[in-house]
Structure formats: C-alpha cells, structure tokens
Amino acid sequence: MNINIKQVSFVILGLVIVTIIFGLSKFNIATAAKKDGKKFDDWVVSCTPGNKETKTPEVCLLSQQLNLTQDDKQQPIALFQVGYFGPEKALKMIQTLPLGVRLEAGTSIISSKKLIAPGKYTTCTQAGCQAVASISDADLKTLTSTKENSVAFMNLEGKQLTLPISIKGIEKGLKYIK
C-alpha cells in the first residue's frame, strides 16, 4: 500500500477547514453580537441573551431613564424602553411609571401636542406600573420629526401628568437593535 503524503495532508487540511467553518457558524462567532450598554445619544441598548434550550431569541431594547433630583440625590421616576417584539417584530414602547397612577386611563405618547399612540397598563410591581404602547411606522415618523415628545398619564387624583421623551439617537438605536 502506497500512501501519498501530499494527498493525506490535503485531506486533513480540508477536514480542519470544514470543522472550523462549521464551528464558527454553530456558535455564531462569525456574526457581530449586539453590545449591551452601547449608547445612542439619550438611549442605551440593553439586551437579554437568547436561550437555545427554550428557543428564546436574544431581545435588545433601547432604554431611557428619567430621574428626579431631590436633596442632591437622583431618583428614577420613569423608564422608557423601545424594541421589536414577537415574530412580526412589532415596535412597542414599554413605559415604567411610578406607583399611584390611574390604571383605567392608560397612557398616551404625545408628539407636538398630538396623541399618537395609546398605552395600556399590563402590570404593577414595587418598581412601578408598566404600560405598553404599539408604535406604527407613521407614529415613529411623527415622533422623530419633532423634539416635543412626551408620555402622559393620570395620577390617582385624576390630574394629567406628562414626562418628556428625548428622541435624540432613537433612529440609529432602532437600526442597531433590529
């Protein structure tokens, strides 16, 4: 039996290359991962890693926190998170607002004094109450075309309160997480 060293080394090299390519694609090393904490002006990326066992995909959101300064201490009063949800990748905003809100009234995303997206409360925890608002392409266009954006809600006494939302960086951030 006559073994050609060149043929054997060629076959082994080929197997090594195929194994490396398969390994990189299997572990997604070849694709760029989203960076948790990456900033887009007033928005920050926060990602929840995917789980292969439960077939849960990675979810990344843009977050913006509003703080109130009291006695030289910053206290969070609201958290706005924007991201794409579900298989249809629907754009939604999760609004975490302080406790003491009127739940049945819901929330409103307002742009230039125009109501563009109503939000419905889904749950309340010790951290606050969460409302979810669906944002259409037209709503996003309206939001990004003006600097006067806010989320409105009612307190327990029935008084409407509004909190500002900065859209600075949201377009670049949404392209990044999509």
Descriptions of predicted regions:
Residues N2-G14, V18-K178:
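A generic "folded-domain core" signal
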